[in-house]
């Protein structure tokens, strides 16, 4: 039997609830731009999938995430949930850029058709 090497990953985040109150007084675009500028911490999910908001304009959001081995499924490729989470995040934030202060949103449905698998060798996904 092959000896397995234990890997570890530390995930750190800031509780998003106190900052979420700011969303009540800022437009969605202002809120996300403040996140990019480091004035508001990224949501905890960003730590899990190495997610970064690259840029936002009205009706558009650009994000990047970098898969690593901690995102693998049992067959040795990145779990589809990683891709679905990235897609859900970027689509939701694109909607958020159009919303006035105090307006919330949520995803009602998400469908993903996969064309090929990802691995940690894929690198940054935008």
Language-model features, listed with the residues they occupy:
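Terminal targeting signals and extreme-terminal segments of soluble enzymes
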Residues: 1-126
